[in-house]
Regions:
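N-terminal cap/lid segment of alpha/beta-hydrolase-fold proteins
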Residues: 1-48
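The alpha/beta-hydrolase serine catalytic core
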Residues: 3-5, 11-14, 97, 131-141
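Short, surface-exposed "cap/lid" segments of acyl-processing enzymes
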Residues: 22-32, 43-85
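Active-site micro-motifs of SAM-dependent methyltransferase domains
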Residues: 58, 88, 130
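Short glycine-/acidic-enriched loop or helix-start segments at secondary-structure transitions
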Residues: 62, 93, 133-135
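Alpha/beta-hydrolase active-site loop
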Residues: 66, 96-116
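Glycine-rich "HGGG/HGxG" loop immediately N-terminal to the catalytic nucleophile
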Residues: 84-97
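Primarily recognizes the serine-hydrolase "nucleophile elbow" in alpha/beta-hydrolase
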Residues: 108-141
Length: 141
């Protein structure tokens, strides 16, 4: 489990947790960041990634830690998981919660994963997180 930060286009920093399953190749995030800054492309990952998008006024763990439980099941199936706090919620920046902001958050998270070699992505979303996901229509998903 790795705690990460993802910056959105409007300069908001999202708090997130990335978990790579034990069966996957290790992921060296500092090395990847250096490569991306140098303009190199990240190697493709063979496993997919599932983004877990929470409901309104919840956080990346979900109510009663339900998203943590779902993430563990996805990892057991060999998938990387990324759980994040929408802007204005949990440990993410901002003090305003809008649907437009959540749409941008989804796009930033999908882009962050794609930049790190995760071409295969799925989103498991609840409530307003599902609405934002459908409206965001990220091309990686």
């Amino acid at each position: 489990m790795t705690e990460i930060s993802i910056d959105t286009a409007r300069g908001i920093t999202l708090a997130a947790t990335l978990c790579v399953p034990d069966t996957a190749d290790p992921l060296d995030l500092p090395e990847l960041s250096t490569a991306l800054e140098a303009g190199r492309t990240a190697p493709a990952r063979h496993e997919g990634a599932v983004i877990l998008a929470h409901n309104f006024l919840a956080d990346r763990h979900g109510l009663a830690h339900r998203l943590d439980e779902l993430a563990a099941r996805y990892r057991k199936a060999g998938l990387t998981t990324l759980q994040f706090d929408f802007s204005g919620l949990g440990e993410s920046d901002d003090d305003v919660i809008t649907l437009a902001g959540e749409i941008e958050d989804i796009q930033a998270v999908c882009g962050w994963l794609a930049d790190r070699g995760f071409a295969r992505q799925a989103i498991h979303a609840n409530g307003l997180g599902a609405t934002a996901t459908l409206l965001a229509r990220p091309e990686q998903v």
